[in-house]
C-alpha cells in the first residue's frame, strides 16, 4: 500500500517546513496516528536486550509499547526544561522525547539542551524519536524549532500529528 501522494506532497512542502524540516516524499510515512508511529519505531528499533530512555513523567502508553517489545526501559526524570541529556543512562540505544511541549509538564526544551541532546546522541551512537506533540500549543512564545530541524547526522526520527490542529 502507498500513502496518498497529494497528502505526502503537502506534508513535505508545507507542514514540515513550518517546523524547519526538509524531507523528500520518500522519507515520509503516514500512519494512523502518533501512537501508531511510536509503536512502529519501537518495532523497528527495539527488542530484547535493547535499551530505551523515556521521560518521567511522560506518555503512559509509550512505556507499555516499549515493554511489549522486551526492551529495557529507563525512565528519566524531567525538570523545568524537559529531559536532561546528561541524565540519560549510558548504553541507551533510543531516546523518546517530547521537546516542544512535554506531556504532562508542558516544559519546552531550550535550544542549548536540544543541541546537547543531539551531541550526546552523536557521541554515543543513540537514536532519538521526537514526538512533536502539541508543538502548536505554545501561546506565550513562537514555537521552538523541531529537534529534527537541528539534526545534521540523521539521528532523529520525527513523529508529528494532525490530531490537535484539525
Cite the ranges covered by each PLM segment.
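Conserved core of the PLP fold type I
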Residues: 1-124, 136-157
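PLP-dependent aminotransferase class I/II
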Residues: 157-166
Amino acid at each position: 500500500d502507498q500513502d496518498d501522494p497529494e497528502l505526502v506532497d503537502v506534508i513535505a512542502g508545507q507542514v514540515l517546513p513550518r517546523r524547519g524540516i526538509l524531507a523528500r516524499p520518500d522519507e515520509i510515512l503516514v500512519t494512523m496516528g502518533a501512537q501508531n508511529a511510536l509503536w512502529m519505531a519501537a518495532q523497528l528499533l527495539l527488542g530484547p536486550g535493547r535499551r530505551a530512555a523515556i521521560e518521567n513523567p511522560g506518555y503512559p502508553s509509550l512505556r507499555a509499547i516499549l515493554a511489549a517489545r522486551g526492551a529495557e526501559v529507563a525512565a528519566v526524570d524531567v525538570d523545568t526544561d524537559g529531559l536532561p541529556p546528561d541524565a540519560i543512562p549510558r548504553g541507551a540505544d533510543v531516546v523518546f522525547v517530547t521537546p516542544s511541549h512535554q506531556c504532562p509538564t508542558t516544559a519546552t526544551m531550550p535550544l542549548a539542551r536540544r543541541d546537547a541532546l543531539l551531541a550526546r546522541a552523536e557521541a554515543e551512537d543513540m537514536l532519538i524519536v521526537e514526538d512533536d506533540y502539541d508543538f502548536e500549543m505554545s501561546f506565550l512564545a513562537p514555537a521552538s524549532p523541531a529537534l529534527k530541524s537541528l539534526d545534521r547526522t540523521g539521528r532523529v526520527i520525527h513523529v508529528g500529528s494532525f490530531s490537535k490542529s484539525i
